[in-house]
């Protein structure tokens, strides 16, 4: 029940030239420009195929992008070659970042919380605080999956071929299994369930919140400063 099949079924989520990716970039670009004055070194954490890494590079940043998936990094490097990009793509563990202390002006963490269990996210936030400069900023964007669950239970259509046929939360709703159905097949994926309150409580162990705003009904954009 990993994400490999999920990204295979929904290729628009990993194709930086797709309409879906373009919409995500258009929604976030004004916020990134507002809260990230141009210039400096940025870590794009859990970068996937690099769509936001390339955006940040276009905005004038020196970008290092990290992911633990060989498949995602291979695609990212193909896109980078096609674009003539100088983004440095690194394979690594977000829980133990391969970078020195105080080495980044910004760390961005975009729409990746579903991949992280509570202990993993705690370690990741701690590492982000370590690698950020004292004057640095942590940019966090996430979907409140806990609030979204009732919507998903109504058989939400996903993409052009699939719909969610079953929603199976565990007893304490820390994870949920979503069953995706099409005319040809079905498959299941397990997501970690993060709500806004839980994210903020964990982040405040290591950061001071400077800004928070709702992007849409279930999505949030937040800015934090390290407690240094």
Predicted segments with their positions:
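SAM-dependent methyltransferase
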Residues: 139-198
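Class I SAM-dependent methyltransferase SAM/SAH-binding core
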Residues: 51-95
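A short glycine-rich, Lys/Arg-flanked "PGG" loop and its adjoining helix->strand segment in the class I
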Residues: 122-134
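Conserved class I S-adenosyl-L-methionine
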Residues: 1-37, 55
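A short SAM/SAH-binding and catalytic strip from SAM-dependent methyltransferases
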Residues: 106-120
């Amino acid at each position: 029940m990993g994400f490999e099949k999920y990204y295979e079924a929904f290729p628009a989520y990993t194709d930086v030239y797709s309409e879906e990716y373009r919409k995500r970039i258009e929604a976030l670009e004004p916020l990134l420009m507002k809260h990230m004055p141009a210039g400096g070194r940025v870590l794009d954490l859990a970068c996937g195929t690099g769509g936001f890494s390339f955006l940040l590079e276009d905005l004038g940043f020196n970008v290092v992008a990290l992911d633990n998936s060989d498949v995602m990094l291979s695609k990212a490097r193909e896109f980078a070659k096609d674009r003539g990009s100088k983004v440095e793509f690194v394979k690594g563990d977000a829980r133990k970042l391969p970078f020195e202390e105080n080495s980044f002006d910004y760390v961005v963490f975009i729409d990746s919380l579903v991949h992280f269990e509570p202990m993993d996210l705690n370690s990741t936030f701690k590492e982000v605080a370590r690698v950020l400069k004292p004057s640095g900023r942590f940019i966090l964007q996430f979907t409140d999956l806990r609030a979204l669950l009732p919507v998903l239970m109504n058989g939400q259509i996903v993409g052009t071929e699939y719909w969610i046929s079953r929603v199976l939360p565990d007893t304490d709703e820390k994870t949920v299994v979503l069953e995706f159905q099409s005319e040809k097949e079905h498959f299941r994926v397990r997501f970690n369930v993060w709500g806004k309150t839980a994210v903020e409580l964990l982040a405040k162990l290591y950061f001071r919140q400077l800004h928070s705003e709702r992007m849409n009904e279930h999505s949030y954009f937040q800015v934090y400063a390290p407690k240094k």
